[in-house]
């Protein structure tokens, strides 16, 4: 086991804070409509230009091991916020930096870190309640477009295309982002269904760049039991090979020799095949398999209906134009099912929704309707160069996640104003002691940080902007894109409540952990042994 380097107290915390600041300072230049670009070197090919906070955070690794710990911890804030809300990564990083910096001053002054953390947690809980109170639901296509545009760094074209996609496939429909072939963004809508089960083996992948298995015009086998014997599968495999078509197997599970044989055939190119687990559990799995069967024109091979896998015929297999199997999702596009049967199935599920008593059942039934009736919208991102295409795709992904979050939990005024208004919930809040009061004041100051950074990136004086916004009420705030003050909701400067909430929660959580850290352990640098100089050559 290699030797470790251990640091305690202030010497440990100061190095962590240095790492936090390096990462946060690199990320926060991207915040707001006037945010700057960050140029990232690649080990091969052209450098990447981005205004996406999480993309910048992911690239940062520091040479000093102790500083790197601080940077990596804050990187978690950005990636966790991106995973949950899809946006707000830069805001979360700015909030975390502010709480850590202010908190460290109090810790250095001798305050109890645990009480500071209790004060911070108490203040954050009150602010989250206030954000929910300020939130308003999102209804119109125009509001969806506004949220998308803000999240895509004030790109209205991206906001509009996302709103159009949601109009076409519904708010619950599946929307994917692909590389376009022209300079303009394009929207393509195809019938399809997505469920949350991915490939059973990574060896089924045939597109290594995207880490997915693409099957064009495949046959689809649906089975409600485990498949472990290859003998049971042989008739279907032979039928698919004769037809010269790829095969998608959806079953309770595929294991043992059956899975091994499928992997070997796939790798050798004998048969393009992918196997996935059936979605859901119990009765819900049966219902979802039946949905897929109706969508693709298949018959579920089930003992309940007297069907046996070893006697399955080509007519009992479903068909689709294309199937995309990802690590955790499968998308069936343009199934060959009969439209009248699909409509009847949707009608039957809608009747079940009316009779459903629990919210959970109702939600799951609505998901099934969306998958059967909604389809898949594909946004094709257009750009002049590959570098621009990658940067634009990142922004479209962000905007798409943000609009979904807005539909889910509503919107609040953007531009850091919602957090500033939420200060009213904690301005008179007190803790159990002076140290907890200090924790509350730390959050009070941190809530100004996003607006200060937005103003600084736009070239304005942060203190003047904060004072002017605080002099107004409600949605009154600073529009950094135009440099004007006014009602931000009316002018379309809005943030999804979920994004703002998640950013603050994650920032406070990680900052609290850093403040209560008293020792750091890292691998000690290895001492390089000096290479002896070569002996001089003798002259003859």
Swiss-Prot record:
GO cellular component: cytoplasm
GO molecular function, one term: ATP-dependent protein folding chaperone
Keyword Flavoprotein: no
UniProt KW keywords: ATP-binding, Chaperone, Cytoplasm, Isomerase, Nucleotide-binding
SUPFAM superfamilies found in the cross-reference section: GroEL apical domain-like, GroEL equatorial domain-like, GroEL-intermediate domain like
Residues reported in the UniProt entry to bind ATP: 30-33, 51, 87-91, 415, 479-481, 495
Record's subunit section: Forms a cylinder of 14 subunits composed of two heptameric rings stacked back-to-back. Interacts with the co-chaperonin GroES.
Role noted for this protein: Together with its co-chaperonin GroES, plays an essential role in assisting protein folding. The GroEL-GroES system forms a nano-cage that allows encapsulation of the non-native substrate proteins and provides a physical environment optimized to promote and accelerate protein folding.
The name this protein goes by in its record: Chaperonin GroEL 2/3
Organism: Paraburkholderia xenovorans (strain LB400)
Origin organism lineage: Bacteria, Pseudomonadati, Pseudomonadota, Betaproteobacteria, Burkholderiales
Gene expressing this chain: groEL2
């Amino acid at each position: 086991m290699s030797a470790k380097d251990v640091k305690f107290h202030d010497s440990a915390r100061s190095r962590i804070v240095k790492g936090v600041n390096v990462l946060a300072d690199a990320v926060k230049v991207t915040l707001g409509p006037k945010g700057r670009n960050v140029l990232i070197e690649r080990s091969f090919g052209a450098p990447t230009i981005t205004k996406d906070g999480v993309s910048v955070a992911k690239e940062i690794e520091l040479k000093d091991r102790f500083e790197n710990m601080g940077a990596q911890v804050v990187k978690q804030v950005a990636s966790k916020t991106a995973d949950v809300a899809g946006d707000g990564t830069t805001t979360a990083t700015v909030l975390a930096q502010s709480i850590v910096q202010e908190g460290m001053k109090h810790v250095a002054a001798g305050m109890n870190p645990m009480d500071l953390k209790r004060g911070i947690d108490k203040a954050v809980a009150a602010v989250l309640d206030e954000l929910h109170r300020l939130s308003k639901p999102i209804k119109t296509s125009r509001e969806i477009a506004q949220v998308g545009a803000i999240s895509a760094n004030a790109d209205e074209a991206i906001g509009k295309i996302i709103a159009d996609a949601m109009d076409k496939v519904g708010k619950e429909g599946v929307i994917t982002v692909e590389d376009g072939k022209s300079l303009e963004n394009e929207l393509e809508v195809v019938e399809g269904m997505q469920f949350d089960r991915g490939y059973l083996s990574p060896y089924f992948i045939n597109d290594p760049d995207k880490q997915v298995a693409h099957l064009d015009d495949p046959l689809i086998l649906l089975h409600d039991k485990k498949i472990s014997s290859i003998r049971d599968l042989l008739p279907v495999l032979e039928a698919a090979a004769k037809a010269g078509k790829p095969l998608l197997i959806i079953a309770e599970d595929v294991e043992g020799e059956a899975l091994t044989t499928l992997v070997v055939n796939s790798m050798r190119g004998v048969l393009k095949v992918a196997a996935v687990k059936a979605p859901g559990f119990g009765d819900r799995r049966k219902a979802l398999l039946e949905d897929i069967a109706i969508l693709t024109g298949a018959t579920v091979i089930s003992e309940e209906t007297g069907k046996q896998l070893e006697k399955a015929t080509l007519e009992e297999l479903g068909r689709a134009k294309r199937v995309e199997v990802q690590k955790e999702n499968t998308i069936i596009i343009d199934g060959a099912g009969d439209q009248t049967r699909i409509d009847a199935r949707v009608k039957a599920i809608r009747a079940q929704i009316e009779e459903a008593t629990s919210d959970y059942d109702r939600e799951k039934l609505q998901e099934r309707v969306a998958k059967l009736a909604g389809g898949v919208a594909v946004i094709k991102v257009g750009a002049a160069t590959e570098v621009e295409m990658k940067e634009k795709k990142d922004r479209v992904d962000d905007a798409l996640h943000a609009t979904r979050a807005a539909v889910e939990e509503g919107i609040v005024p953007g531009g850091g104003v919602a957090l500033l208004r939420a200060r009213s919930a904690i301005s008179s809040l007190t803790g159990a002691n002076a140290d907890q009061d200090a924790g509350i004041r730390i959050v009070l100051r941190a809530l100004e940080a996003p607006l200060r950074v937005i103003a600084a990136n736009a070239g304005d004086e942060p203190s003047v902007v904060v004072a002017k916004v605080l002099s107004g009420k409600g949605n009154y705030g600073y529009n950094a894109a135009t440099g004007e003050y006014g009602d931000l909701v009316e002018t379309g400067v809005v943030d999804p409540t979920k994004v703002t909430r998640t950013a603050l929660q994650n920032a406070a959580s990680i900052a609290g952990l850093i403040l209560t850290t008293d020792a750091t352990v890292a691998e000690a640098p290895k001492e390089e042994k000096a290479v002896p100089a070569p002996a001089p050559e003798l002259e003859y």
